[in-house]
Every structure is written in C-alpha cells, then in structure tokens.
C-alpha cells in the first residue's frame, strides 16, 4: 500500500492548481512545440525536436508525480488543530528560543509542503517532533541536531 502524504487543505489546493496548470497550459504548449519542431524536417539532427521531447518527458513526469501526491494525500483539517490546545500538524506555533530569546512563529505542515524560508516546518523536523502534542507554556529541548537548544511555546493557533 502507498504511504500517505500529509497535507494541509491549502497544500492540496496548490497541488490541484499545479496539476490543472500542467494539463491545461503547459502540456498543450509542449505539444505545440513538438509539432513545430517536427515540421522543421529531418528529426535525426533536430535539436529543437530533442529539446521538446525532453521537455515533454519532464512535464509528463511532473503530472504523474502531482497526481500521485494528490491521490495519496491525507488532508489535515487545520481549522480544528487548536481546539485541543496541543500542537498538531497544521498548528501555527509561536515560541521563544533559548538561542536568542526572540519570539518566532512557525506552521507545522507535511514534509512536501515544508518551506523553512516561509516558516513552514516539516512535521518530520526535530523542532516539530519535539513540540507536537505539547501545550502553551511548555518548554522542550530540541535534540537530534548538532547544538541542542530549548524553546518555550507561547501560543498555538
């Protein structure tokens, strides 16, 4: 059986939008490029044709990948994540780190949605593993990294 892919509803919608774009815009454009390159004549030495075939293979692979992700998606209802008062996948968490004593905010998401530059942290990361299931005003140590540190959870949304 295939492994489930954990996604927020927003992440699922982004994948569906990407798939629609690939199917309705990108794939037809690549097919058009293939036809144009094919019309140039001799295919044995046609660099445009080779490039279009490579692009087609890339697009078809991405379409298949996105379809697989959508089909294996387990959507986390992040509207219910704060009802228990515990950190869960989909929670937005504010915390203070012992490294710099500054208030920071992250959202815990599935691994494929993770984007640390946007403060979207994978549920498989050391920080998420340490705080999932914890409540406000709990201090935890972030381990499994080269320099462990502590954080105190200030709010959960």
Curated annotation (Swiss-Prot):
InterPro entries: GreA/GreB_C_sf, TF_GreA/GreB_CS, Tscrpt_elong_fac_GreA, Tscrpt_elong_fac_GreA/B, Tscrpt_elong_fac_GreA/B_C, Tscrpt_elong_fac_GreA/B_fam, Tscrpt_elong_fac_GreA/B_N, Tscrpt_elong_fac_GreA/B_N_sf. Residues 1-75 form a coiled coil. It comes from the Bacteria. One of its GO terms (molecular function) is DNA binding. The keyword Calcium does not apply. Pfam families: GreA_GreB, GreA_GreB_N. GO terms for biological process: DNA-templated transcription elongation; regulation of DNA-templated transcription elongation. Gene3D superfamilies: Transcription elongation factor, GreA/GreB, C-terminal domain, Transcription elongation factor, GreA/GreB, N-terminal domain. Keywords: Coiled coil, DNA-binding, Transcription, Transcription regulation. Necessary for efficient RNA polymerase transcription elongation past template-encoded arresting sites. The arresting sites in DNA have the property of trapping a certain fraction of elongating RNA polymerases that pass through, resulting in locked ternary complexes. Cleavage of the nascent transcript by cleavage factors such as GreA or GreB allows the resumption of elongation from the new 3'terminus. GreA releases sequences of 2 to 3 nucleotides. PANTHER family: TRANSCRIPTION ELONGATION FACTOR GREA (PTHR30437:SF4). Belongs to the GreA/GreB family. NCBIfam families: greA, PRK00226.1-4. This is Transcription elongation factor GreA. The gene is greA.
């Amino acid at each position: 059986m295939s492994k489930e892919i954990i996604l927020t509803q927003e992440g699922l919608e982004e994948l569906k939008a990407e798939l629609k774009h690939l199917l309705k815009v990108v794939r037809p454009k690549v097919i058009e490029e293939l036809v144009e390159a094919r019309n140039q004549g001799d295919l044995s030495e046609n660099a445009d044709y080779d490039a279009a075939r490579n692009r087609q293979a890339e697009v078809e692979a991405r379409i298949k990948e996105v379809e697989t992700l959508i089909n294996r998606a387990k959507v986390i209802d992040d509207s219910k994540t704060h009802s228990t008062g515990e950190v869960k996948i989909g929670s937005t968490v504010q915390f203070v780190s012992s490294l710099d004593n500054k208030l920071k905010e992250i959202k815990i998401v599935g691994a494929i949605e993770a984007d640390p530059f946007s403060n979207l942290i994978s549920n498989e990361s050391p920080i998420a593993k340490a705080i999932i299931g914890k409540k406000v005003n709990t201090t935890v140590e972030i381990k499994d990294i080269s320099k462990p540190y502590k954080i105190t959870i200030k709010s959960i949304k």
